[in-house]
A protein has these predicted regions:
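PLP-dependent enzyme catalytic core of the Aspartate aminotransferase-like
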Residues: 17, 21, 29, 33, ...
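Active-site phosphate-binding strand-loop segment of PLP-dependent enzymes
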Residues: 115-171
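N-terminal "arm"/small-domain region of PLP-dependent enzymes with the aminotransferase-like
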Residues: 1-36, 167
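Conserved N-terminal alpha-helix of the aminotransferase class I/II PLP-enzyme fold
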Residues: 25, 30-73
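Conserved PLP-anchoring active-site segment centered on the Schiff-base-forming lysine
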Residues: 80-99
Length: 342
């Protein structure tokens, strides 16, 4: 960074697969075979065998009937929610959901859907909203792991509520590197998964996995699928190779190493996203700068990304971090605590 070597605690490369030799080799081979880009949308001439192979692998990995690729995870949420939205549809969204879900809900509203936000992880509030809209076609959408706090949605309880009110449950699995995929049917509720290829898998792209009928609908209706160039062969091949690593003994070992890192930095925390909430923007910026002086890149997150008064350091851990790097981070955080964040 600016001529200095620093250790990044800002990347979403949770398992370190962007640098995995098998993943890199797959991208190179795909580029040599199919070219650097797809050249067109999937419904014109942009589809390559690697796209279909990856979609099949995602469906198998996620335990779903089928899956469809999008250029990014952001585009996947936009395409899914805009397609689900329409007159007579009510979408219920956690207030701390990712921006892609928020914008997808806006597109759904433009298509005639009603959108209600429920308080963060407040199942009673959600239950009240669901009951108030009985008779409508209802959708509940949530992050599985929330991107700023690193906390986890109670999928089983959400599914029970959805089953009770005949609602579809959509879960954004973007940051869910340590949790097993939800089943297609949880406590009687149909579960649709949205995911990204850019975090756990170290590539670029997004997907929706769910019932075959929904995937077919998205292929024919989702504008962020139809009217955009297909994902590159390199990214698709890299993601496919990464899935195979994740499903192997090596993948399990990487996940266990990540769990161990989390336990050293924040015992009991459920995800590799660890917030250090400092309150005001100045304190967060000063703490980030102090860590940078120590060779540790930890970003300060401020409004409007987070609420006023909750500015923070956002630590993102990776299995690629060494034990010494984790030790340096722990020591630096203790120093900040002793110095009052300055």
């Amino acid at each position: 960074l600016e001529g200095r070597t620093v250790v990044s605690f800002a990347s979403n490369d949770y398992l370190g697969l962007t640098a995995h030799p098998v993943v890199q080799a797959a991208a190179i081979e795909a580029t040599t075979r199919w070219g650097s880009g797809s050249g067109a949308s999937r419904l014109v001439v942009g589809s390559r065998p690697i796209h279909h192979e990856l979609e099949d692998a995602i469906a198998q990995w996620r335990g779903a009937d089928a899956a469809v690729l999008f250029p990014t995870g952001f585009a996947a949420n936009l395409g899914l929610l805009a397609t689900l939205g329409g007159t007579g549809v009510v979408i219920h969204s956690d207030e701390l959901n990712h921006a892609s879900i928020i914008d997808g809900c806006r597109m759904a509203r433009a298509n005639g859907a009603a959108v209600h936000r429920y308080r963060h992880l407040d199942l009673d509030h959600l239950a009240t909203n669901l009951a108030a809209n009985a008779g409508a076609r209802q959708v509940v959408v949530t992050d599985t792991v929330f991107s700023m706090d690193g906390d986890i949605a109670p999928i089983d309880e959400l599914a029970s509520l959805c089953a009770q009110h005949d609602a579809l449950l959509v879960v954004d699995e973007a940051h869910a590197v340590l949790e097993p995929p939800p089943e297609p049917l949880v406590n009687g509720a149909i579960v649709v998964q949205v995911g990204t290829l850019s975090k756990t898998l170290g590539a670029l792209g997004g997907f929706v996995a769910g019932p075959r009928s929904l995937i077919d609908l998205l292929v024919n209706r989702a504008r962020t699928y139809i009217f955009t160039t297909a994902p590159s062969p390199a990214d698709s091949a890299a993601a496919l190779a990464a899935i195979r690593v994740v499903q192997s003994e090596e993948g399990a070992a990487l996940q266990q190493r990540l769990r161990q890192h989390i336990a050293r930095v924040a015992p009991g925390h459920p995800s590799p996203i660890i917030p250090v909430i400092l309150g005001d923007e100045g304190s967060a910026l000063a703490a980030s700068q102090r860590l940078l002086e120590l060779g540790l890149l930890v970003p300060a997150i401020r409004p409007p990304t987070v609420a006023v008064g909750s500015s923070r350091l956002r630590i993102a851990l990776s299995a690629a971090h060494t034990d010494d790097q984790i030790a340096a981070l722990v020591d630096a955080l203790r120093m900040l605590e002793t110095d009052g964040g300055q």
